[in-house]
Amino acid sequence: MFFTFLCTSLAFNEESLPSGYRNIKLGMTLDEVKDALKKDFQFGYRGERDVSLMPDQQKILIETDTSRTAPSSFLDKCWFQFYEDKLYIITINVKPTRMDHYSIFSTLSKKYGNPGNINPQKSEWSNDSVIMTLERPLTLKYTDKKVYEKLMEESLVQNTAQEMSAQAFLEGL
């Protein structure tokens, strides 16, 4: 009985996982992210020159760099990946001269509980909609879990078709 109460209390003390950092949230459109980046100098966004179309044609990438535009920021380089005009991955490199891995890990563990998956390279928290990862040396990543799983499923189907084509080619030799 006490154990159940303790677990329930701990669960309510932990915050739900964030869907992004500052005013940039997973699921935002490309234009919404551009507008939010323009208003927040911490990311070092320089406008359209930071936006590129990935070879896949359905994916757009925004890459920011604070080295020239926001040297006092805790952030270094950041990447914002879109699929079907929706933000589905936020990758933030934190400056190791301004912050350390242990401080971020401790803060995240205190706010969101222990990571569900941990190894020497990364710590991962997740729920039904978000995967939040702290990677070494100092990268924080927010991923839309549903979009990620959909893309992984699609890539497995494509690999299977490619494997079948390769097998057919080899059989024809």
Task: Name these PLM-found stretches.
Residues 12-56, 89-173:
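Non-cytosolic coordination micro-motifs
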Residues 1-7:
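Bacterial N-terminal signal peptides
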Residues 55-97:
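Mid-chain, structured segments of secreted extracytoplasmic proteins
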